[in-house]
């Protein structure tokens, strides 16, 4: 249910980029000052139809640039570009959380031409998502986060505002005990005031889950095992919702159509509830993903590639994606567009995209070590395999593990 947000677990592939830097400088000067040439574009297979129209419009406005649109797999962007950068796409769709790895490996071309536009036109969290070490590398076009889907026949708008009332009035089907709990409940630590890789998500030694707030989070997770309003659900979450076994579940915009099929006009969607870890209600947070386009470091037509990437993430293009696919725009102006704010799921995502409700998923290379370590701690805590007396030691080990850069 993670919709391509999660990155692959492959580690950083070191690539010599000195020659590429020289080529970049040469291609950005002289005759290359005019955006022209042939550019290969990779987009996910399921979106090819939409992008054919967008690319056709781009070529009309930019007759000196010819785009070769090809199907790719955005979730595997780093791996696929690294295989053969010179043969890969000049512009490619990617989840933002691979940017740190790709930048460090010399695989991704910095946004040297449209950095100012990206910063001015998109919300701060989207800009943060495509920025690595104070340099903008990619071009955002959508934000996505998990939201709370619920049955409006079971809950009133007030009853979904706290985890306590949510699980007292009905039952939520969610995953504490299997793979994937890391993505849903890892942000609980940030909800309670902790940091994952520091305040900006770029410090390998900046995770501080091994404190009192972290212990409170583990105790809360353990308590959910005996909460009658919590039903352990993973792949069966949607069927449980449709059958009435559960009344709510947490997922992203990728589940919207399936939830509508399951609940019909009873479907509601809202931002996450608050949680009491023992010191009053705190806003439950989620990871925020930023869908983006990026330019291959080895492109032979950098100006043309950047021109295309910028067009694909423009206000006009983002509105097309919302209408045709359902992507929630990162563009500031569109986030106040009435057509978007009146959409139930989009409205919930816009609220979740605020810093009070989400944390931009870190793009640091070490994040690949976080996922398995976090899953193990959440799963075992929920199942009772970790006793309260061992919480501190487990969190110490978790923090140690998350600072490691995984090996190939």
Identify the residue ranges that each predicted region occupies.
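Hinge/lid segment of periplasmic solute-binding proteins
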Residues: 96-147, 158-159, 163-164, 270-271, ...
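Conserved N-terminal structural module of periplasmic/extracytoplasmic solute-binding proteins
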Residues: 4, 10-11, 18-98, 277, ...
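Long, aromatic- and glycine/proline-rich binding clefts that accommodate carbohydrate-like moieties
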Residues: 323-376, 380, 404-408
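Extracytoplasmic/periplasmic solute-binding protein
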Residues: 137-141, 146, 164-207, 213, ...
